[in-house]
C-alpha cells in the first residue's frame, strides 16, 4: 500500500507541474494545394446553406481570444499566422493571442477561468485536458460537417488517421489537432555495421543480439570506464513505456479505465528488464545528454522524441562524428509501434457567432500550407498527408525526420481519458521503478506482475 500511495502522490504533483506537451497512412490524396495561402472561405458553384444559423455579417469585428503554451520560434510563428489571418480573412474576425508558456499553466489557468466566465474562446491544450473540461468544450463536429463552413470529405480524409481520431470521444469532437509528435528508437547504423550487422533488427531476438554485441564490444576495448555501456540507453518516459507495451500487444486503456496487468505488458517488462540484467541496457547519469552519449557511441540505441532530433544531429556535429543514424519504431514480434501524442485546438461554448468565428480560425490553421510552416518550425509530425507535398526540400535536409514520418501508419493513440494526465505519471514511475537495481536487482517471475498490479491500483484511484 505504501508503494501505491507514493505512485498517487507523485502523479498528482507531476500532473500539475509537468503537463507535457509528435509511410503516412495510405488514403486518397487531394489535388496538390496551391502555393498561395487561401484565407477566404472555399467557394463552390452551388454552395449549400449553412445549418449553423449565423449571419455572416455578424462575424465582422468578432473578437476571439486564444491562449497557447508556446514561446520562442513557435510563438513567433503562431502570432505571425494570426496577423496574416486578421489581415486577410473575409469575415473581419479578429484573433488575439496570449502565451501561457507551457501546458501546465494552460490547464491551471483555463480550469480557473471556466469557473468565473473569464476563459478564452480557444486554447491549445492536450486532449486529456479537454476531456476534463467536459461540457464547457464546444463539439466541433457540427462545424466540421457544415455544408458552408465545414470541411469536405476529401479534406477530412487527408488527415492522418491516428491524428484525426484522437480528439473524438463518444461521438463528440473535443478538439482539432494542433501538433503531434512521437518517440522513436534511434539506431547507429555505422557502428552496427562495424559490429557485423547489415540491417536494423527485425525481431526481439535480433534486437537483443545487437544491443548485447555493442555491450561486449565496449567490454573488450581499451577503456575500462565504458564497460557497463553499449546497448540500449534506458528511457523511462511514459510514451517510451507505452510504445514498448503496444509492441508486445499490451497497452494502457480498457474501456473507461486502465489495465496495466496484461500478458503483453508483463512480457514487455520482463524482456526489457532481462536486457538490463545482461548489461545490454543501462541507466545513464544525467551529466550528459542523450544525444551526446549516442554520438559518443555509448549506446547503439537511444530513445528520443521527434522534436529532439535536431539536438541529436547537433551532438553528432559537436562530436565530429560521421556515423549514420536512423529512426526506427518500437519493434515487437508481430508489430512495430509508435505512440502519437500532442496538443489540440479546443474551443469553448459561447455565443453562436463567436463559436463560428473560432472554428473558422481553427480551420484556416489546418490548411496544408500552414501545417507545412509548423513542421519546418517545430520538426514534428505532419497532420495531413498532403502537407508532405510541400515538404520535399525539408525531407531531404532532415532524413531522420523523413524516416520517422513513414511510421505514422504504425501509430497508436494515447488513452482517451481525462485522468491520463495523472496516470501517465504512474506509468512512468512504474517503468522507472522496474529498472531500479537496488529495489529490483533481479526481476523474478512474479515481480513484473506485482509492479503492474500496483500501477493498476494507483490508476484506479486516480481515475475515480
Which residue ranges define each predicted feature?
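Conserved C-terminal helix/tail region of periplasmic/extracytoplasmic solute-binding proteins
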Residues: 35, 41, 193, 409-464
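Extracytoplasmic/periplasmic substrate-recognition and gating elements
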Residues: 193-195, 266, 274-281, 316-383, ...
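Long, aromatic- and glycine/proline-rich binding clefts that accommodate carbohydrate-like moieties
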Residues: 49, 325-328, 376-429, 433
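Hinge/lid segment of periplasmic solute-binding proteins
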Residues: 47-58, 127-184, 223-224, 322-329, ...
Amino acid at each position: 500500500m505504501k508503494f501505491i500511495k507514493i505512485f498517487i502522490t507523485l502523479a498528482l504533483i507531476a500532473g500539475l507541474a509537468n503537463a507535457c506537451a509528435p509511410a503516412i497512412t495510405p488514403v486518397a490524396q487531394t489535388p496538390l494545394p496551391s502555393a498561395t495561402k487561401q484565407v477566404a472561405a472555399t467557394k463552390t458553384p452551388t454552395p449549400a446553406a449553412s445549418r449553423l444559423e449565423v449571419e455572416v455579417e455578424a462575424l465582422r469585428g468578432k473578437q476571439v481570444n486564444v491562449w497557447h503554451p508556446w514561446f520562442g520560434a513557435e510563438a513567433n510563428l503562431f502570432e505571425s499566422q494570426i496577423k496574416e489571418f486578421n489581415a486577410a480573412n473575409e469575415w473581419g474576425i479578429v484573433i488575439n493571442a496570449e502565451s501561457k508558456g507551457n501546458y501546465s499553466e494552460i490547464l491551471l489557468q483555463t480550469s480557473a477561468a471556466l469557473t468565473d466566465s473569464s476563459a478564452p474562446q480557444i486554447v491549445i491544450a492536450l486532449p486529456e485536458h479537454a476531456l476534463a473540461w467536459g461540457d464547457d468544450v464546444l463539439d466541433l463536429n457540427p462545424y466540421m460537417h457544415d455544408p458552408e463552413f465545414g470541411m469536405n470529405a476529401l479534406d477530412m480524409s487527408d488527415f492522418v488517421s491516428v491524428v484525426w481520431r484522437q480528439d473524438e470521444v463518444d461521438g463528440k469532437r473535443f478538439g482539432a489537432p494542433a501538433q503531434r509528435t512521437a518517440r522513436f528508437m534511434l539506431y547507429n547504423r555505422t557502428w552496427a555495421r562495424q559490429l557485423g550487422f547489415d540491417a536494423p533488427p527485425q525481431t526481439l531476438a535480433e534486437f537483443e543480439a545487437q544491443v548485447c554485441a555493442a555491450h561486449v564490444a565496449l567490454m573488450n576495448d581499451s577503456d575500462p570506464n565504458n564497460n557497463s555501456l553499449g546497448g540500449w540507453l534506458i528511457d523511462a518516459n511514459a510514451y517510451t513505456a507505452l510504445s514498448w507495451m503496444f509492441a508486445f500487444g499490451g497497452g494502457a486503456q480498457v474501456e473507461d479505465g486502465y489495465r496495466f496487468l496484461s500478458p503483453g505488458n508483463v512480457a514487455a517488462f520482463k524482456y526489457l528488464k532481462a536486457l538490463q540484467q545482461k548489461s545490454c541496457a543501462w541507466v545513464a547519469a544525467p551529466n550528459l545528454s542523450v544525444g551526446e552519449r549516442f554520438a559518443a557511441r555509448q549506446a547503439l540505441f537511444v530513445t528520443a522524441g521527434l522534436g529532439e532530433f535536431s539536438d541529436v544531429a547537433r551532438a553528432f556535429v559537436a562530436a565530429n562524428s560521421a556515423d549514420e543514424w536512423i529512426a526506427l519504431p518500437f519493434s515487437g514480434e508481430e508489430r512495430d509501434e509508435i505512440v502519437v501524442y500532442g496538443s489540440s485546438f479546443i474551443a469553448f461554448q459561447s455565443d453562436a457567432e463567436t463559436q463560428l468565428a473560432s472554428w473558422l480560425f481553427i480551420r484556416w490553421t489546418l490548411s496544408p500550407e500552414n501545417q507545412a510552416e509548423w513542421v519546418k518550425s517545430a520538426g514534428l509530425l505532419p497532420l495531413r498527408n498532403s502537407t508532405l507535398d510541400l515538404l520535399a526540400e525539408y525531407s531531404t535536409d532532415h532524413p531522420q525526420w523523413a524516416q520517422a514520418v513513414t511510421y505514422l501508419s504504425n501509430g497508436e493513440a494515447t488513452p482517451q481519458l481525462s485522468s491520463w494526465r495523472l496516470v501517465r505519471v504512474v506509468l512512468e514511475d512504474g517503468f522507472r521503478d522496474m529498472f531500479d537495481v537496488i529495489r529490483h536487482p533481479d526481476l523474478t517471475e512474479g515481480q513484473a506482475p506485482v509492479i503492474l498490479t500496483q500501477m493498476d491500483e494507483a490508476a484506479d484511484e486516480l481515475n475515480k
